[in-house]
A protein has these predicted regions:
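Acidic/polar surface patches and capping/hinge elements
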Residues: 23-239
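Bacterial Sec-dependent N-terminal signal peptides
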Residues: 1-29
Length: 239
């Protein structure tokens, strides 16, 4: 009896493992997370942290921002206010979604892509399996086959790139010390973010969107349009 129960348990566990490990989709349990609150821990010295990939945080030059009384900056403020004045309910939901944190959301996007591509291609007539080719990623079988080794490397590449990009971002934030638009003009709303004294330029959301999207485009070349759409979504949510 005990042996039979053990066999039944083992078979059930195996079936469950196969079923969930090969799913193309994942459930989202974080849609209603509150906005990330880092006002009390700005890590203003983060620009001096040791990088992983970059030799220095200023390896890539970020141009000096325009003065807050310049015509271009005032035009940008007016554009922000115009955008904020006509927000739809869908846009407000997107703002709330990204307010939970770019690192979290891009990790979830990555999980979605890994799950989608975590299925081996269908076998050929002779019983052999075709191999995805990075040289021709748009032909069947689609590249990549995101098996555990590929997925682990992909997560590592993106995490390291995000880390270095944010260190560089913080380096220039403290260098230029540009106040956030809502501090320059009180009529600008701080939608989806907790007000703080963190310098606003360059935008950490724009940096996060840029580095995450470009890395994912290389790792999942058949998803370029989807990845670019998510990057633009994060950038607009910050406005």
């Amino acid at each position: 009896m005990k042996k039979g129960m053990l066999i039944l348990f083992t078979v059930t566990l195996t079936i469950s493992f196969v079923q969930f490990s090969c799913k193309k989709s994942i459930s989202d349990r974080t849609a209603d997370l509150a906005a990330l609150n880092s006002a009390g821990n700005l890590d203003l010295n983060a620009g001096a942290w040791k990088t992983v990939l970059l030799a220095r945080p200023d390896t890539f030059v970020v141009a000096t921002p325009a003065a807050t009384n310049s015509t271009g900056y005032i035009a940008d403020l007016n554009e922000i206010k115009g955008y904020q004045h006509n927000l739809t309910s869908q846009q407000k939901d997107i703002i709330k979604y990204w307010a939970a944190g770019g690192v979290l959301r891009w990790n979830e996007i990555m999980r979605t892509l890994v799950a989608k591509y975590n299925l081996p291609p269908y076998q050929n007539a002779d019983g052999t399996y075709p191999i995805p080719s990075s040289a021709n990623p748009f032909a069947y079988p689609l590249f990549p086959f995101s098996n555990p080794p590929y997925a682990a490397r992909a997560y590592g590449y993106i995490s390291a790139a995000q880390y270095d990009a944010l260190i560089a971002c913080w380096f220039y934030k403290t260098k230029y010390n540009r106040a956030a638009p809502y501090k320059v003009d009180s009529s600008v709303q701080a939608n989806g973010v907790v007000r703080s004294d963190l310098p606003a330029y360059p935008s950490e959301a724009a940096v996060m969107a840029g580095v995450s999207a470009e890395m994912m485009k290389m790792l999942f070349p058949d998803e370029i349009a989807y990845i670019q759409q998510r990057a633009q979504e994060q950038e607009l949510a910050t406005i």
